[in-house]
């Protein structure tokens, strides 16, 4: 059967690459104990050897602090082997069992409890679906109380590849276990802040324990971006490691060469904090603020005032040299109009303290991109007008090329990967951590998201200003929260609600980003863009994802009204049309809800049925004990 699932070159044909068991050894720590097929061709299934690219696999599959929980689930990403291919998606279920309960206790088991993790390495980002199947298998594997019984794991590999062989990334099964409703109920208006943070390609760290809450929240935020889960993560774990950044930083010497990538920009090095120049402009402003409609959107540290003189040492900065496109500094050519906030008066009506949340300041500006693409046949390098994302895009250019060119998505980051936070080839990241050491390294990131408390800590006042919600933003967020809370009981009862449901929320964010993109293409669009935040849009236009999108044509956007929902009279009409439309297709929404809600049950039922059949056949074959076994 294995031969049927593999091509002549030995490469697996199905979406599942490997089934791996990771255990904790009292002397060696976390290590791979079993892999099928072997992680390295030619090795045995019990080999501990790891490919260099996957050296962190044991620490991801069996996370830090696992001993504090009886069982948990982890989502993680691995880079492709040999630099070829796409991200490998890992789903791991770990459990622990008392050593005295084991039927067969191996000699190296010296502790009172045994921790092991069963994980699937897949080519498809089917997080929830694989989790549902894997939880049952892990439970059955532990129920054997004999970890040498690996036949069930080999059969799991074959079963998953046969059942998922024709799996599509376009259906609702991609979003299983990712609930925007729960996210909105928990973060409320701050969901839009998280959305904008990632649009700006900032360094964002999510923090909470246990791991399943962490990865669930992080991946749910990403599911708000159209097409991101399905097609936007294929390059999210690739980077070219170089030396870590020192305090003095020699960034000019460490910039990636143009030929390091298919497409390269002169300004792709992290642009998270702009050092002393921005601080001089900023001056001193009040920091703590409250909003009438909501608790403070950002957690502001009291010590930030005293940190101003030391900012040059605390924050990572991009190269100070000017771009090759201009002999002047980007700051010298900055349009003074971007220093003004046209929405300040309007926001004062919502809350008198809100406009003082961030000091007025300018926005980073970067050089225009230079695209390098090898020419077919000749192999010569030529300049071409458009940047290539390398992603499978729809007619609107979705998903945006956020997680490309060294901007990483790490749903769970092991402590052993800490160096990535200061690697100069990592433009930014959206990462999750459970170890408090990550949270303490605030100078290495732009924002820390405390999931448990629904807090967003941003220590850079200029970034807080960029993310300061406009009146239109607050209306949009309130529109979401109101519909989710009003329909909470109905959706919970039958799981099929449309308005306020998971698919409905994703539809609202799709309209939001489509309208924002359409607005950037309009002439005389200052008033429209002010609804999203003039300074925010200016900063966003300098990100890699926007430059890639803007360098290509998307005719379908001509049909999009460039007004965000709830931001004006026309915007309100759009919102009303969406509500009417959603009511008209409520039956379709219920069908979608039923398919999503039932997919978990369906997956578990199918796996239980297969597991029952496998267990029965195994029991029959073991009616008589083998020779030599008591």
Curated annotation (Swiss-Prot):
<feature type="modified residue" description="Phosphoserine">
    <location>
        <position position="244"/>
    </location>
</feature>
<protein>
    <recommendedName>
        <fullName>Late secretory pathway protein AVL9 homolog</fullName>
    </recommendedName>
</protein>
<keyword id="KW-1133">Transmembrane helix</keyword>
<comment type="similarity">
    <text>Belongs to the AVL9 family.</text>
</comment>
<dbReference type="GO" id="GO:0016477">
    <property type="term" value="P:cell migration"/>
</dbReference>
<keyword id="KW-0472">Membrane</keyword>
<feature type="domain" description="cDENN">
    <location>
        <begin position="173"/>
        <end position="340"/>
    </location>
</feature>
<comment type="function">
    <text>Functions in cell migration.</text>
</comment>
<dbReference type="InterPro" id="IPR037516">
    <property type="entry name" value="Tripartite_DENN"/>
</dbReference>
<feature type="region of interest" description="Disordered">
    <location>
        <begin position="299"/>
        <end position="372"/>
    </location>
</feature>
<feature type="transmembrane region" description="Helical">
    <location>
        <begin position="214"/>
        <end position="230"/>
    </location>
</feature>
<feature type="compositionally biased region" description="Polar residues">
    <location>
        <begin position="306"/>
        <end position="315"/>
    </location>
</feature>
<keyword id="KW-0812">Transmembrane</keyword>
<dbReference type="GO" id="GO:0055037">
    <property type="term" value="C:recycling endosome"/>
</dbReference>
<dbReference type="GO" id="GO:0016020">
    <property type="term" value="C:membrane"/>
</dbReference>
<keyword id="KW-0597">Phosphoprotein</keyword>
<dbReference type="InterPro" id="IPR051731">
    <property type="entry name" value="DENND11/AVL9_GEFs"/>
</dbReference>
<feature type="domain" description="uDENN">
    <location>
        <begin position="17"/>
        <end position="161"/>
    </location>
</feature>
<feature type="domain" description="dDENN">
    <location>
        <begin position="342"/>
        <end position="575"/>
    </location>
</feature>
<dbReference type="InterPro" id="IPR018307">
    <property type="entry name" value="ABL9/DENND6_dom"/>
</dbReference>
<dbReference type="Pfam" id="PF09794">
    <property type="entry name" value="Avl9"/>
</dbReference>
<keyword id="KW-0967">Endosome</keyword>
<feature type="modified residue" description="Omega-N-methylarginine">
    <location>
        <position position="570"/>
    </location>
</feature>
<keyword id="KW-0488">Methylation</keyword>
